[in-house]
Swiss-Prot record:
Entry superkingdom: Eukaryota
Region Type E motif, residue ranges: 489-564
Xref: PROSITE patterns: PPR (PS51375)
Pfam family, one: PPR_2
The keyword Repeat appears for this protein: yes
Family to which this protein belongs: Belongs to the PPR family. PCMP-E subfamily.
GO molecular-function terms, A-Z: RNA binding
GO cellular-component term (any): mitochondrion
Protein's GO biological process: mitochondrial mRNA modification
Protein name per the record: Putative pentatricopeptide repeat-containing protein At3g05240
Keywords: Repeat
PPR repeats: 37-70, 71-105, 106-140, 141-171, 172-206, 207-241, 250-280, 281-315, 316-350, 351-381, 382-416, 418-448, 454-484
Entry-linked Gene3D superfamilies: Tetratricopeptide repeat domain (1.25.40.10)
Gene: PCMP-E82
Length: 565
């Protein structure tokens, strides 16, 4: 009788398209006593944990808790559901509960648990799961081993990932793909390319995902030579310059190639390929707009943005970040306000990354009031958001406003400043000549928050003291600090010498920095400028001859804070 009832219900479950329908079927199961049968219940949980239209993990959990002895299949359904959810930590809780109640995981359980570990970057839990995988003999399973490899790579443990890869019985395209993707995500681009070559020598053909990862690698390390080789490789597989192959147009590969050329600075080829695309996605538009923006061609980036809007394509977060960057390059506050107004209409103004970009844009264009207003509109202000606005204001000449924001951050108490926050604060103090305040903040780092100053923090303090002409304190700090002085430290001292015409200290620094070429051209230039102002032309000549003989090129210098933006 029960079997007679649940077969039609199973059939109806297959056709279920909404949570309302699922609730109705659940009620029918209770009414017809089918609720006691584990088969329809397991299917009900499946629909609550896998189907987008009926996804409801709370509902699935209530059904799960009504089952006296859930099977491993049902445990797996719950773990899978949570591993794919915004709360993957609950998948680990279910896994632990499963073990506690004496159930034995199978080769479906481990991949779901390892996926949760990957999402959480929980290497400690993942290592424990690895141990249990070995204990139960599932390390020989290809699917489980590949998930272990992926987990270690996601957690940044590349060497452990390599060991897992080497122990995989048979290296198929999925295993190679996980290895190459792991290398790329951990910025080991040459290793990714070498792995591809080894894969080819093993007779395994690359799939679309692998080719995309390799193009990403070439773009990130700006290796256009290898990128062009991969472009030719794709053409050898049947793709012409317009990506039309025997199986049709591949928009993903096309976009990846455009992105690679743009990141390598070859905008001409990137645009040629973009114009030749028979169809474009938002990602395609973002690639070309971002390419122009990152390469300093703000006008073309904004033109492409307007073209995209004319075609009725709605921008996303990536689009806005690129356009805001382009507006910042243009240095026009009015243009920035227009973009800000458009961002507000779309609802992206609540996104922390976009608000931080707007703040930096306004700060750079000299509009400190608009920068502060944009920041005020952000509902949730975490440490990163506070830090970005502080550094944005400080690095663009609005030191007092930066310190005012920092004071509010401390008063609110809902975010704790970190080392980068204090770098912005010290930079602000340096540029408005607040010596005592700078010393107080420098001490506060360690005393209140347990933050050990880095060479960048020491550089800011040396700059503060040197600008104020307090050279004895600056020298004492350089001699007693626990880190080796770098170009920023010596540069800060020499900058103070330049301001206050301190030739005695300049000579001492020149003798202390035995090989200034190791620190770059900036030290040479500062020394030369100081001696030129003092009319010591013989010293200027010696320095310039030294630069020429040692082939030191004159380049523009930037502070450690300025290079962050």
């Amino acid at each position: 009788m029960m079997k007679k009832h649940y077969k039609p219900i199973l059939s109806q479950l297959e056709n279920c398209r909404s949570l309302v329908e699922l609730n109705q079927l659940h009620g029918l199961m209770i009414k017809s006593s089918v609720i006691r049968n584990v088969i329809p219940l397991s299917r009900l949980i499946d629909f609550c944990t896998t189907c987008p239209e009926t996804m409801n993990l709370s509902y699935a959990r209530s059904v799960f808790e009504s089952i006296d002895c859930p099977s491993v299949y049902i445990w797996n359904s719950m773990i899978r559901g949570y591993s794919n959810s915004p709360n993957p930590d609950k998948a680990l809780i279910f896994y632990q509960e499963m073990l506690r109640k004496g159930y034995s995981p199978d080769y479906f359980t481990f991949p779901y648990v390892l996926k949760a570990c990957s999402g959480l970057r929980d290497i400690q839990f993942g290592s424990c799961v690895h141990g249990f995988v070995v204990k139960t003999g599932f390390e020989v399973n290809m699917y489980v081993s590949t998930c272990l490899l992926h987990m270690y790579m996601c957690c940044g443990e590349v060497n452990y990932g390599l060991r897992v890869f080497e122990d995989i019985p048979q290296w198929n395209v999925v295993a190679w793909g996980s290895l190459i993707s792991g290398f790329v995500n951990n910025n080991r681009f040459s290793d990714a390319i070498e792995a591809f070559r080894e894969m080819q020598s093993n007779g395994v053909k690359a799939n679309e995902t692998i080719m995309v990862d390799l193009l990403v690698a070439c773009g990130r390390c700006k290796d256009i030579v290898t990128g062009k080789w991969f472009h030719g490789f794709l053409q050898g597989l049947g793709f012409d310059p317009y990506f039309q192959s025997k199986v049709g147009f591949n928009v993903i590969l096309a976009t990846s190639l455009i992105d690679m050329y743009a990141k390598c600075g070859d905008l001409r080829t990137a645009r040629y390929l973009f114009d030749g695309m028979p169809e474009r996605t938002l990602v395609s538009w973002n690639s070309i707009i971002t390419g122009y923006s990152q390469n300093g061609d703000a006008e073309e980036a904004l033109c492409m943005f307007l073209d995209m809007l004319d075609l009725g394509i709605a921008p996303d977060k990536v689009t806005f970040l690129s356009v805001i960057r382009a507006s910042m390059i243009q240095g026009c506050s009015q243009l920035g306000q227009s973009i800000h107004a458009y961002v507000s209409k779309t609802g992206f103004v609540k996104d922390a990354a976009i608000v931080c970009a707007l703040v930096n844009m306004y700060a750079k264009t000299g509009d400190a009031e608009s920068a502060k207003k944009a920041f005020e509109d952000l509902e949730k202000k975490d440490t990163i958001a506070w830090t970005v606005v502080i550094i944005g204001l400080a690095s663009h000449g609005h030191g007092n406003e930066a310190l005012s924001i920092f004071q509010r951050m401390q008063e609110k108490g809902n975010a704790t400043p970190d080392g980068i926050t204090y770098l912005g604060v010290l930079y602000a103090c340096s540029h408005i000549g607040l010596v005592e305040e700078g010393q107080r903040y420098f001490a506060e780092m360690r005393d209140l928050h347990g933050l050990e100053p880095t060479v960048e923090h020491y550089g800011c303090m040396v700059d503060i003291l040197s600008r104020a002409g307090r050279f004895e304190e600056a020298e004492r700090l350089v001699k007693t600090m626990p880190v080796k002085p770098n170009v920023n430290i010596w540069g800060a001292l020499l900058n103070g010498c330049d301001i206050h015409e301190n030739l005695e200290l300049t000579d001492r620094i020149r003798s202390m920095v035995a090989e200034p070429e190791e620190l770059g051209s900036g030290i040479y230039v500062l020394l030369s400028n100081i001696y030129a102002k003092a009319g010591r032309w013989a010293d200027v000549k010696l320095i310039r001859e030294s630069m020429k003989s040692k082939r030191v090129d004159k380049v523009l210098g930037h502070s450690s804070v300025e290079t962050m933006f």
